Regions:
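N-terminal beta-propeller domains
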Residues: 1-81, 137-212
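Surface loop/turn motifs at the tips and blade-to-blade linkers of beta-strand repeat domains
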Residues: 40-45, 89-93, 130-134, 185-188, ...
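Hydrophobic or amphipathic alpha-helical targeting/insertion segments
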Residues: 98-134, 138
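Blade-edge beta-strand/turn elements of extracellular beta-propeller
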Residues: 129, 213, 218-226
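Acidic/polar residues in short coil/turn loops that connect beta-strands
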Residues: 112-115, 121-125, 144, 152, ...
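Short coil turn/linker residues within repeat-based beta-strand modules
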Residues: 78, 123-125, 171, 217-218
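Tryptophan-centered short beta-strand motifs
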Residues: 78-84, 125-129, 224
Length: 226
């Protein structure tokens, strides 16, 4: 235990407070040092490119991870990363691509760039991930209200780096544009989409700015404001 004074960075000089506290966390009295890193699981087959945690139907946590060609679940009993990829695993991710995951009403959904369409795992009954038929491949994914929101997408053999593509209302399986509020939107003059933050509305991060996507219902579905 390190018995420093209270952290008071904005006080005058020569007070009893500490102005710099590195590698410590607050404790009942003062601060205590952070613990060293320790190994949590056995190794995957390749460098991990994403990790995600979600609770299953019983409330127990599950940990998922992905590398360049596989998706894994952490097995607590033996600390292994068990391959739960779809049959045949995945086309290798691009050099700069990573796995990004969401929890959508109990379904864990993963996006990994332009080489594989969205993957889904029912966190109560599934043993393997599976393709979401007719979904796009996407570099970015988020939950926005009752929609699965993707950005910087590829489908139909074409790549759309400045396009968002969202699912049908309250459905992760509906991706027919113009049906049940599934639709697309190009973000012009802002460069490629570099990220999406979900929530009540979409915060779309682009190379040259930020766009807000707000649900307004039919016929527009979402309104996008720069």
């Amino acid at each position: 235990m390190k018995n420093f004074g209270e952290w008071l960075p904005d006080q005058p000089d020569n007070t009893s407070g500490v102005t710099t506290a590195k590698n410590v966390i607050p404790a009942a009295r003062g601060y205590r040092g952070l613990q060293d890193l320790s190994q949590y699981s056995n190794a995957a087959d390749n460098r991990l490119r994403g990790i995600f945690a979600a609770k299953d139907d019983t409330g127990d946590p599950k940990i998922f991870a992905g590398d360049v060609t596989k998706l894994y679940e952490f097995t607590k009993s033996n600390s292994n990363l068990t391959n739960i990829s779809k049959g045949g695993n995945y086309t290798s991710l691009g050099n700069d691509d990573i796995w990004k995951f969401i929890d959508f009403s109990g379904f864990v959904i993963g996006a990994s760039g332009h080489n594989n369409i969205l993957q889904v795992y029912d966190n109560g009954t599934s043993s393997l991930f599976a393709d979401i038929a007719n979904s796009p491949a996407a570099k970015h994914i988020a939950v926005v209200g009752d929609f699965v929101f993707t950005g910087n997408v590829k489908y139909g053999g074409n790549t759309y780096p400045n396009r968002v593509y969202f699912s049908s209302l309250a459905s992760h399986t509906g991706w027919t544009i113009g049906t049940d509020q599934s639709d697309i939107q190009d973000i012009f003059d802002m460069g490629d989409i570099t990220g999406i933050v979900g929530g009540e509305y979409a915060t779309i991060l682009c190379e040259k700015g930020i766009v807000r996507g707000s649900y307004v219902g039919t016929p527009l579905i979402f309104q996008f404001d720069k």
